[in-house]
Amino acid sequence: MAYSTSVIRRLAPSEKFFAETQTFTSITVLLDGTVDIDAMADAFDALLEAYPVYAGHLEPDSDGGFELVADDLLHPGLWVQFEGDPAPTDQLDQGVALIYLLVKPDSTPVEVTLFIHHSLADGTHMAGLLFELFARYTEVVTTGSAGPVSPNPAPEPIETVLEQRGIRKQQRSGLDRFIPAMFAYELPPKRVTTRSAAERPAAVPTTRCRLSKAETSSLVKYGRVNRLFVNNLISAAILLAEWQVRRTPHIPIPYVYNVNLRALVEPPVSATGCTLAIGVATYLAHITPQTTMVELARGIADMFQADLADGVVQQSLLHFNMQYEGAIPGLPDVVLSTNLGNAVAMSTPPGLEVVGVQSQFYRASSAVIDVYSFGVVGGELLIEHHVDAAETTIDLIRSLLRSVVSEHQH
């Protein structure tokens, strides 16, 4: 049987890589209480009505790219997984849908996981959808209705957002900062993975650590005393840990990190108005045994402000695509991170409380992925390391951050 389809648009260059690797990103909300499955299904249906593009799918086009396609098929709906059931994540399929929802009602704590295709959503976009899902769920539980629904158009790619605002490609990309380190050192072997090429998306192993609310608060205060944001300190801790485990003290470390552009362009962009509203900032870290976390964090912060003032960060994705795999020839292994931001209180009905949040990548590729993500959830700092090679740094990062917290407290 043939179903009618219509092409919404082609994927832009910034989005294409994640279609090639079939990458889905997930956010899992950990909950204390009971989730009403029927109410969550109603809220999810309302979310799909409000953002119908995610009920569509991707199809290869004739030019080696991908098209975003709408069809008349119903979305398969949410998954419910009870203890002992097989995981439904092997059904993630960009040729069927671009969003999925999984509820584990009898796990402790209860888990609700939203999966979205990474071509169509960065972390901020995903958080916007997740917060709306829980707002509608709260409405269903407390009033019996998910609230009014007005369909939203498909989000624009970053290329269109920049063009509409007169932001054009400059000479510099930001990666030019790494040129002095290219082919300048005898490099150790590149990290490898035992993963074989997969036809369907598979979970990338993820290691996590947290700081308590008190530790996170102390870290924020420590940053203020030193005129630094927490993300600068976390970036410095990640780089110091990488420097220690690499055992190549004379080789600088290239650092690449995402920057949310939504509030940095005029007019600003809404959370769900653009697929990947990110720029890329870079830093080449020259670390010695005498390098302090504050010194390194200030170097990162100062370089970012300079590149932002010059407009380099805003137009960076017009030079290259954001990728989580592969290596630049002749360059030491790049450290890549993404800042999940500070999650404000999510709407929940009485008797249901958010006790944690975590993220995961699912992808079909045999290349090494190595990316850090971090953010503040419920007042607690969460740091994640998504890597399908040996993980050696997460405990060290936590230890480094706790050491400055302890220093500040005393």
Swiss-Prot record:
The residues annotated as site (Structural role in the organization of the active site) are 122
SUPFAM superfamilies per UniProt: CoA-dependent acyltransferases
The superkingdom listed in its UniProt entry is: Bacteria
- Give the positions the UniProt entry annotates as the active site: 118 (proton acceptor)
Which Cys pairs does UniProt list as disulfide-bonded? none
- Record Pfam families: PapA_C
**Enzyme Commission code:** 2.3.1.282
One GO process term, biological-process aspect: lipid metabolic process
Enzyme class at the top of the EC tree:
transferase
Which of UniProt's keywords are assigned here? Acyltransferase, Lipid biosynthesis, Lipid metabolism, Transferase
Reaction catalysed by this enzyme: 2 a mycocerosyl-[mycocerosic acid synthase] + a phthiocerol = a dimycocerosyl phthiocerol + 2 holo-[mycocerosic acid synthase]; 2 a mycocerosyl-[mycocerosic acid synthase] + a phthiodiolone = a dimycocerosyl phthiodiolone + 2 holo-[mycocerosic acid synthase]; 2 a mycocerosyl-[mycocerosic acid synthase] + a phenolphthiocerol = a dimycocerosyl phenolphthiocerol + 2 holo-[mycocerosic acid synthase]
One Gene Ontology MF term = acyltransferase activity
**Family in the record:** Belongs to the acyltransferase PapA5 family.
The subunit field of the Swiss-Prot or TrEMBL record says: Monomer. Interacts directly with the acyl carrier protein (ACP) domain of the mycocerosic acid synthase (mas) protein.
The entry's function note states: Catalyzes diesterification of phthiocerol, phthiodiolone, and phenolphthiocerol with mycocerosic acids, the final step in the phthiocerol, phthiodiolone and phenolphthiocerol dimycocerosate esters (PDIM) synthesis. Can directly transfer the mycocerosate bound to the mycocerosic acid synthase (mas) onto the substrate alcohols.
Domain characteristics, as noted in the entry: Consists of two structural domains that are related to each other.
- Protein name as it appears in the record: Phthiocerol/phthiodiolone dimycocerosyl transferase
